[in-house]
Regions:
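Glycine-rich phosphate-binding loops that contact phosphosugars or nucleotide phosphates
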Residues: 41-137
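An N-terminal, well-structured beta->alpha segment
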Residues: 1-41
Length: 137
């Protein structure tokens, strides 16, 4: 029975954390959703490490619900895969620090291409946060 008690406790903790996010939603979130909905190209989601795992899930969820989307690994991007990004795409980039080297190396090319960037980062005033047209902490 202790396993069941622990499982319930874990689910209660996770549910409370999700509910706490409700109060953190603001206009930036609405702007990001609007940008994705209006996207004429694809939604490209990118991030390294644990953020990359979350990005893969975001891309898979978008694709499975009818939004053309895919995950682009930042290390692969800087070694030739940046050519897949077009100006009518929307890029969502995630990095807790906002300074992940592989990801920050992609940002200059994104700027040149003109694809709008939604930055998801905990790093206020970071390279990623500064580069995003929509910044969600």
């Amino acid at each position: 029975m202790p396993d069941l008690t622990l499982a319930r406790k874990v689910l209660q903790t996770e549910a409370a954390a999700v509910l706490a996010l409700v109060d953190r939603l603001d206009d930036r979130f609405a702007e990001a959703v609007s940008l994705v909905v209006r996207c004429k190209g694809r939604v490209i989601v990118t991030g390294m490490g644990k953020s990359g795992i979350i990005c893969r899930k975001i891309a898979a969820t978008l694709a499975s619900t009818g939004t053309p989307a895919f995950f682009l690994h930042p290390a692969e991007a800087v070694h030739g895969d940046l050519g897949v990004i077009q100006s009518d795409d929307v890029v969502i980039a995630m990095s807790y620090s906002g300074e992940t080297e592989e990801l920050t190396r992609v940002l200059e090319t994104l700027k040149r291409i003109g694809a709008p960037l939604i930055a998801l980062t905990g790093g206020l005033k970071s390279t990623l946060e500064t580069a995003g047209i929509i910044r969600i902490p």
